[in-house]
């Protein structure tokens, strides 16, 4: 949601969530205890567990690229407590949780008793104002000083206190603040101008004069505000204002000459005007409308005298919290809550888009594209029709019709939606949306102007930069999370509407603390697994076959950056070891290495064709060096596959791969067949081996295989052509990119669509492997090395 955003009464879990400090309880991690726990893991982890057990002491002592001090881990119990607190807050979601608005509260406080008596209709609002003045005499966000925010909140509160002649000391202190700071208006970043400020603040100045307050209305700092007001009012078509729901309904209190009979046709079902307290209070003062009174009475009672900027905001909150949990790498802990939120969003989806609440009469592009992307990625069918409502005749995409300037964050969310959730056969609007948003963001990036009109976030520029540099197809989950840990502002992020406001549920320190603790645990496990993998490579003399520590590290990184859950070590290491062995065999085949003999390849195929037990009993048939490769393959097949059926499946997969390798002169290993071998290995190591059984494959599985093989083959052939410098033309490269993009859309549709025949995690395996190929093709070796360092070895602080 953009520019519209209310606090739910803090539940116990939410209150605890807010009280969590950024500090992290740290204790020394008990590696021997972890080794004992691993020893009790299921037997099919086999050599993976044994390697980790044997490497644990060395892994503690050996700290390559980590530095002199190693980050101490969160106790599992403490992480579980944080997960429990977050889960409770997610399950207690109501109308939305944002902070209160002194400005809106002041407008409600101005409503006189409707029964004809003296005094305010809502005296609790006066009490709230008196109790929430800041030490400098102002009202507003206490952690971020924006001149406009402090002035509009403070002046509104001063007017309310003066109107009822109460708390004169607070009134005078607030008035002094206004006089002292009005000259500072030009200091604010133009991108951060409050919505409607140019019409609302001059209105407040006139109201202040009417109640006898001395106002510096001729201050030079106000001249620009007056000019913007006159320009905006001249541009507003009064007929549209009174007949079509627009964002202007948020600022009715700053609009002259309103026709209330016509405007009430735009009143929301809950009695408000666009679910906002200030325009609703103004309408109540002007008309005495009972539905306005009911809305305000409910709000003020619910929040004990305070009024939020807008309420409810439950649709906005539910969508955004899913996005934050996924990007922080925490989604696996909250599957049920995420599913519930998206089911709610889908119930209220329309082809005209969505807004910040289910009954919102004004849809915005930000909520719409965030919902569009997340719903599609979770198997819901949503069409592209909604995007057309935000495309202008000039080919631009806007948050609202009639907006005065563009939003960086909204265009970034539009780009993410068009990049990540485009399917074959989509209307051209998706392609146009991607092209427009990409061009806009690149232009703002080039000019160094990535501050946004809707959110104040120090991490937004780097977030946008990373998103533009790494399109979704080449963006690995754990790399994205590692970057987002530095971009996610937590409770420091401030949203801009008519006032500054904060969304407590999805911008808080507990989310950040939990995500960092979880990622640190992941890093510790990766370092242990890497030590085991490196030792395994050394034991089997794989360096003799061209496997360097760097190439083995890269193979492990690609696996861990995709499959990162703590209980999926077998899948990670199965992927990594398969990639390493495939590289070793390919190197032998393609080089003049003395060990790369025809007899060895024939022997490998022969062993795979046999009953599967000869590998362990081959005696002196091969040299010690050759035995290393056979040993490695033997361990992978017989020890990582749980049960004879699984090992037979994996043996058959290797046989197929080897035969394709010999048939195609070794080049095929760079692409599709190796990718399918990785997929089948991951599935077998996970225990989901029935899906990889050639005789049990449903049609959808075959389609996933076909697309994965095709994409990875194209990327592999492109890499080979670059290495061989065979004169590939730019046109050919562009054609190849277009084909890959088209097939990636097909693969995404196959993976995301909801089907019961194949599990979601199995479909994700195809996507993980394919995106890893895209990532390697997209990234320079230096970039990959920097990501390895950041994801695995650089402590999260």
Put a short name on every predicted segment.
Residues 1-797:
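Terpene synthase/cyclase
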């Amino acid at each position: 949601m953009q520019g519209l955003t209310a606090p739910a009464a803090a539940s116990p879990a939410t209150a605890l969530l807010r009280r969590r400090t950024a500090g992290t309880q740290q204790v020394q991690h008990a590696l021997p205890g972890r080794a004992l726990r691993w020893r009790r893991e299921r037997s099919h982890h086999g050599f993976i567990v044994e390697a980790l057990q044997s490497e644990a002491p060395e892994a503690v002592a050996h700290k390559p690229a980590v530095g002199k001090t190693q980050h101490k881990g969160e106790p599992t119990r403490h992480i579980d407590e944080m997960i429990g607190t977050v889960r409770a807050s997610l399950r207690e979601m109501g109308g939305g949780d944002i902070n209160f608005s002194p400005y809106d509260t002041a407008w409600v406080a101005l409503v006189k008793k409707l029964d004809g008596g003296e005094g305010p209709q809502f005296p609790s609002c006066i009490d709230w104002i008196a109790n929430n003045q800041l030490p400098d005499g102002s009202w507003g966000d206490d952690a971020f000083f924006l001149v406009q925010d402090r002035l509009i909140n403070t002046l509104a509160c001063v007017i309310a206190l003066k109107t009822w002649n109460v708390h004169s000391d607070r009134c005078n202190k607030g008035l002094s603040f206004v006089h002292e700071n009005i000259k500072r208006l030009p200091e604010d970043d133009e991108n951060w101008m409050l919505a409607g400020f140019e019409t609302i603040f001059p209105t407040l100045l006139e109201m202040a004069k009417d109640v006898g307050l001395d106002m510096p209305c001729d201050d030079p700092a106000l001249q620009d505000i007056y000019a913007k007001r006159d320009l905006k009012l001249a541009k507003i078509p009064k007929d549209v204002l009174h007949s079509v729901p627009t964002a202007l309904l948020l600022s009715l209190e700053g609009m002259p000459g309103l026709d209330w009979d016509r405007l009430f046709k735009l009143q929301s079902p809950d009695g408000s005007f666009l679910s906002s307290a200030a325009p609703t209070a103004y309408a109540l003062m002007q008309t005495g409308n009972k539905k306005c009174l009911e809305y305000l009475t409910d709000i003020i009672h619910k929040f004990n005298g305070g009024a939020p900027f807008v309420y409810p905001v439950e649709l906005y909150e539910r969508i955004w919290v899913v996005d934050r949990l996924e990007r922080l790498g925490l989604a696996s802990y909250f599957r049920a809550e995420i599913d519930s939120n998206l089911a709610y969003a889908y119930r209220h989806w329309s082809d005209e888009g969505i807004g910040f609440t289910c009954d919102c009469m004004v849809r915005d592009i930000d909520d719409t594209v965030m919902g569009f992307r997340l719903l599609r990625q979770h198997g819901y069918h949503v069409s592209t029709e909604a995007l057309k409502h935000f495309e202008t005749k000039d080919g631009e995409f806007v948050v609202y019709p009639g907006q005065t300037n563009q939003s960086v964050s909204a265009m970034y969310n539009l780009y993410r939606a068009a990049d990540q959730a485009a399917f074959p056969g989509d209307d051209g609007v998706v392609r146009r949306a991607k092209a427009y948003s990409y061009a806009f963001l690149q232009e703002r990036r080039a000019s160094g102007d990535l501050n946004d009109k809707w959110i104040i976030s120090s991490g937004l520029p780097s977030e946008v930069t990373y998103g533009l540099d790494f399109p979704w197809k080449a963006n690995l989950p754990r790399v994205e999370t590692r970057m987002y840990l530095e971009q996610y502002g937590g409770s420091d992020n401030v949203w801009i509407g008519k006032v500054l406001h904060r969304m407590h549920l999805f911008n808080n320190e507990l989310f950040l603390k939990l995500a960092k603790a979880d990622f640190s645990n992941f890093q510790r496990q990766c370092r242990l697994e890497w030590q085991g993998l490196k030792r395994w490579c050394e034991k089997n003399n794989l360096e003799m076959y061209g496997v360097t520590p760097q190439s083995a590290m890269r193979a492990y990184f690609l696996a861990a950056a995709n499959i990162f859950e703590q209980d999926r070590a077998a899948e990670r290491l199965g992927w990594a070891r398969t990639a390493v062995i495939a590289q070793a065999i390919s190197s032998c085949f393609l080089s003049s290495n003395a060990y790369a003999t025809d007899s060895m390849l024939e022997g490998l195929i022969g062993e795979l064709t046999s009953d599967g037990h000869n590998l362990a009993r081959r005696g002196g048939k091969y040299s010690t060096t050759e035995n290393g490769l056979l040993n490695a393959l033997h361990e992978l097949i017989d020890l990582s596959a749980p049960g004879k059926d699984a090992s037979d499946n994996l043996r058959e997969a290797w046989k197929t791969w080897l035969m394709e390798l010999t048939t195609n002169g070794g080049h095929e290993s760079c692409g599709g067949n190796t990718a399918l071998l990785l997929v089948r290995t991951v599935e077998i190591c996970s225990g989901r081996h029935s899906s990889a059984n050639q005789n049990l494959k449903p049609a959808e599985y075959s389609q996933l295989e076909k697309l994965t093989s095709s994409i990875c083959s194209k990327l592999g052939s492109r890499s080979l052509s670059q290495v061989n410098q065979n004169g590939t033309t730019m046109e050919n490269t562009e054609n190849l990119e277009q084909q890959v993009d088209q097939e990636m859309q097909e693969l995404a549709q196959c993976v995301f669509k909801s089907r019961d025949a194949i599990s979601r995690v199995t479909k994700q395996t195809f996507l993980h492997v394919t995106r890893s190929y895209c990532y390697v093709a997209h990234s320079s070796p230096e970039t990959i090395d920097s990501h390895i360092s950041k994801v695995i070895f650089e402590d999260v602080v």
